[in-house]
């Protein structure tokens, strides 16, 4: 285009009249190029645009999608919105149902409603997040947290998060905002309440330990009673057996001596024990008679 203008200027006659004509052509070409550039704009991916008209204001029925668009220079101005979801973290101190101070933080994922961009611009402008989100989040948090005790905020955290999301979503609709996600990222209490909770947990653990020791003592007592009853029964049976046949104790001695002999035989050292060392007293005639009589009775059985 510049070369064409030079060629055109070369064909013009020399002198003041020719220079003036060349300047007019240059100005006209520049104005045309400027007008073309100002008449075209691009809406990038993840964006939407609306028109502001100098005569009629915001055009309510025009929402431009992504791509190349045209406008009337000086009369129409495109206003571009980013409609992609953006995260924002908001913290708010509030009070619980039992009057405990709670510091709670939310991560909110929001985006504007593309179908309502013209009315949103008229009411809130482009900085809608700063105007709306802090106020409605604080309002909803105070309303929801006040329905729960401090302990319930911990044990029923999922229910609290669901209720916050439901109320915040409904509240955001009034401002043409869409909430894609709401999550509790932090939940803390005052130092006094935290210390009281820790002291309560320690007391509960000590009480449980004391209860365990009591139950253990009871079980040990029952075990001793059962053991004592068993020993008494065994002693009674042993006494009855001895009264019926005195040779029973002699037989027990023989079996004990056999066990001792087996143990000694299995060791590496060699030890020789007599009947007296094994406490058998084999020379006693009563021992022999009692043992034979007991063995004879067991053989008959």
Swiss-Prot record:
It comes from the Eukaryota. Residues 19-49, 150-174 are annotated as: Necessary for transcriptional repression. Residues 190-237 form a coiled coil. SUPFAM superfamilies: Band 7/SPFH domain. GO terms for cellular component: cell surface; cytoplasm; mitochondrial inner membrane; mitochondrial prohibitin complex; nuclear matrix; nucleus; plasma membrane. One of its GO terms (biological process) is mitophagy. Pfam families: Band_7. GO terms for molecular function: protein homodimerization activity. It is found in: Mitochondrion inner membrane; Cytoplasm; Nucleus; Cell membrane. Keywords: Cell membrane, Coiled coil, Cytoplasm, Membrane, Mitochondrion, Mitochondrion inner membrane, Nucleus, Receptor, Repressor, Transcription, Transcription regulation. InterPro entries: Band_7 (IPR001107), Band_7/SPFH_dom_sf (IPR036013), Prohibitin (IPR000163). The mitochondrial prohibitin complex consists of two subunits (PHB1 and PHB2), assembled into a membrane-associated ring-shaped supercomplex of approximately 1 mDa. Protein with pleiotropic attributes mediated in a cell-compartment- and tissue-specific manner, which include the plasma membrane-associated cell signaling functions, mitochondrial chaperone, and transcriptional co-regulator of transcription factors and sex steroid hormones in the nucleus. Belongs to the prohibitin family. This is Prohibitin-2.
């Amino acid at each position: 285009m510049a070369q064409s203008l030079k060629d055109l200027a070369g064909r013009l006659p020399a002198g003041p009249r020719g220079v003036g004509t060349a300047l007019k052509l240059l100005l006209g070409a520049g104005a045309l190029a400027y007008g073309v550039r100002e008449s075209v704009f691009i809406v990038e991916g993840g964006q939407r645009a609306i028109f502001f008209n100098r005569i009629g204001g915001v055009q309510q029925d025009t929402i431009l999608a992504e791509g190349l668009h045209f406008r009337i220079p000086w009369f129409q101005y495109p206003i571009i919105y980013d409609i992609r979801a953006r995260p924002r973290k908001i913290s708010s101190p509030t009070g619980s149902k039992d009057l405990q101070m709670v510091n709670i933080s939310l991560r909110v994922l929001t985006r504007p409603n593309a179908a309502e961009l013209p009315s949103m611009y008229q009411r809130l402008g482009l900085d809608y997040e700063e105007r709306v989100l802090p106020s409605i989040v604080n309002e909803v948090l105070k309303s929801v947290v006040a329905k729960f005790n401090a302990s319930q905020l911990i044990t029923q955290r999922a229910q609290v998060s669901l209720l916050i999301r439901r109320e915040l979503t409904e509240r955001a609709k009034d401002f043409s905002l869409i909430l894609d996600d709401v999550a509790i990222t932090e939940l803390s209490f005052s130092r006094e309440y935290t210390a009281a909770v820790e002291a309560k947990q320690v007391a509960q653990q000590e009480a449980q330990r004391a209860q365990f020791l009591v139950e253990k003592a009871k079980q040990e007592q029952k075990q001793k009673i059962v053991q004592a009853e068993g020993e008494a029964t065994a002693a009674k049976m042993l006494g009855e057996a001895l009264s019926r046949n005195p040779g029973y104790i002699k037989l027990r001695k023989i079996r004990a001596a056999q066990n001792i002999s087996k143990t000694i035989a299995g060791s590496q050292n060699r030890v020789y024990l007599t009947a007296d060392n094994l406490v058998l007293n084999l020379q006693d005639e009563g021992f022999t008679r009692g043992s034979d009589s007991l063995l004879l009775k067991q053989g008959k059985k």
